[in-house]
Amino acid sequence: MNEKKQKQRGLKQGFELIYKYRFVLSFLLLIMLVSFKISGSSMGCWKLFLGDGESGIRLGEPRVWRSDEWGTLTPLCFRQQYNTLGAYNRYSQTLGSILTDNMLVYGQPSWDILTLFRPFYWGYLFFGSERGLSWFWCSRLIVLFLSWFELGMFITDGKKKLSVMLSVCVSFAPFLQWWFAINGLVEMLIYGACFVLVQVCRKPSGRQRSD
């Protein structure tokens, strides 16, 4: 019986440490995922057109019906590295004979003041296409999870388990995962949660966090 209590106490202490250092651990997790070029892209679908070769798939399988991602957004972002006007230029003539504003077409990564407000594209600018894609996918999922966990802590008066459940339900909702890479849906949920949290922090509250 004492051994069981010790295990429970050890687990509780472990979870408390994770909670205490959640931001540091999340950042380290992001670094690891980006280092190994991990993403949820369905770029493996290009194998259907390019023939046999290493697909790079380690878990799951590419989803053909997510063509807005692997057939449009991701190739456009990759194209930016090879922009004939300079890597990640705001304008491009790579396709077509006239200048195209890359910030207006799917909001592609560009060396432009507007990209300061699009941190999930910074990976492309600093790490290149492969790790930029990983940064785009992993940073959005991690920040989405954290922001909704913090919002859950406010909504539930500091109940960690309920907050984790809320964060999981939002982050892995089928509708959200279907449109995860495009349409700015993830960013909308992140900024919405952060906006509420900022407003909460600006106003004194008597709520106390608890287990």
What are these regions (language model features)?
Residues 181-183, 207-211:
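Alpha-helical multipass membrane-protein architecture
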Residues 38-41, 126, 130, 204:
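Short secondary-structure junctions and interdomain/linker hinges
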Residues 187-191, 211:
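Catalytic-core regions of glycoside hydrolase
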Residues 11-18, 158, 199-202:
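Extended hydrophobic/Leu-rich segments
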Residues 37, 147-155, 196, 200:
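Hydrophobic membrane-targeting alpha-helices
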Residues 1-43:
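Start-transfer (signal-anchor) and selected internal transmembrane alpha helices
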Residues 193-209:
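Membrane-interface transmembrane helices that cradle and orient dolichyl/undecaprenyl
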Residues 46-188:
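Active-site lumenal/periplasmic loops and adjacent helix-entry segments of GT-C-fold
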